[in-house]
């Protein structure tokens, strides 16, 4: 059975950058964001239930889910948010477990932004946190997504704190520096962790 390394970090931490460095080494990924999009794909049963609940205004002209419109709709409405989470989380969790079970590589990177918040840590053998300061989160996210600071702050407030996330970490990659300056260091750190995880996987399956 594949050894599972959970990769997590707050908004703007650079999880995708780190995940890509692992894939460059041939490590397979199971990405929660990809799974979350798959379960509400166009014409899917779950998307039909969401439209039934919220109305067709949460769809794009192509009939796909408008994630920004849905996010805005539920963010300040706790009942709607609870309804949506109760619908989606079990389906996403089952799909992720299925994908993890299908992996045959020595270890798999399980990329989940809300790994701790959604209580998915039990699916992991080890947890890797990409750590940045709250100031870096705000600066990066506002540049990347053209979100205003208030929206980003709301998202950050809905996630666990930096301190809480670090309590769960078995391994930490600090990603505060600019990528252009920091890339060689990140590549070296990922290579070291890759070799360590291969050894851990071998020990688990011995």
From Swiss-Prot:
Belongs to the CoaE family. PROSITE patterns: DPCK. Its main location: cytoplasm. Pathway: Cofactor biosynthesis; coenzyme A biosynthesis; CoA from (R)-pantothenate: step 5/5. Keywords: ATP-binding, Coenzyme A biosynthesis, Cytoplasm, Kinase, Nucleotide-binding, Transferase. GO terms for cellular component: cytoplasm. Transmembrane segments: none annotated. It is an enzyme of class 2 (transferase). ATP binds at residues 12-17. Residues 4-204 form the DPCK domain. It is found in: Cytoplasm. The keyword Lyase does not apply. InterPro entries: Depp_CoAkinase (IPR001977), P-loop_NTPase (IPR027417). Its EC number is 2.7.1.24. The keyword Kinase applies. Catalyzes the phosphorylation of the 3'-hydroxyl group of dephosphocoenzyme A to form coenzyme A. One of its GO terms (biological process) is coenzyme A biosynthetic process. This is Dephospho-CoA kinase. Signal peptide: none annotated. PANTHER family: BIFUNCTIONAL COENZYME A SYNTHASE-RELATED, DEPHOSPHO-COA KINASE-RELATED. It catalyses: 3'-dephospho-CoA + ATP = ADP + CoA + H(+). It comes from the Bacteria. One of its GO terms (molecular function) is ATP binding. It comes from Haemophilus influenzae (strain 86-028NP). NCBIfam families: dephospho-CoA kinase (TIGR00152). It holds the Pfam family CoaE.
């Amino acid at each position: 059975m594949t050894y599972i390394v959970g990769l997590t970090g707050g908004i703007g931490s650079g999880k995708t950058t780190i995940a890509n460095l692992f894939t460059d080494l041939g490590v397979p990924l199971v990405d929660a964001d990809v799974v979350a999009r798959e379960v509400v794909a166009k014409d899917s049963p779950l998307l039909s239930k969401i439209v039934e609940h919220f109305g067709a205004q949460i769809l794009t002209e192509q009939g796909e889910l408008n994630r920004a419109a849905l996010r805005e709709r539920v963010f300040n409405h706790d009942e709607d948010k609870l309804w949506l989470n109760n619908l989606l989380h079990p389906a996403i969790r089952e799909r992720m477990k299925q994908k993890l079970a299908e992996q045959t590589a020595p270890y798999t990177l399980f990329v989940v932004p809300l790994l701790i918040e959604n209580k998915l840590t039990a699916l992991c053998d080890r947890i890797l946190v990409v750590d940045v300061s709250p100031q870096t989160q705000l600066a990066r996210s506002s540049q990347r997504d053209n979100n205003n600071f208030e929206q980003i702050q709301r998202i950050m407030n809905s996630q666990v704190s930096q301190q809480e996330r670090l309590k769960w970490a078995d391994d930490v990659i600090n990603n505060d520096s600019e990528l252009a300056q920091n890339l060689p260091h990140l590549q070296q750190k990922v290579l070291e962790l890759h070799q360590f995880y291969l050894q851990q996987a071998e020990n688990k399956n011995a």
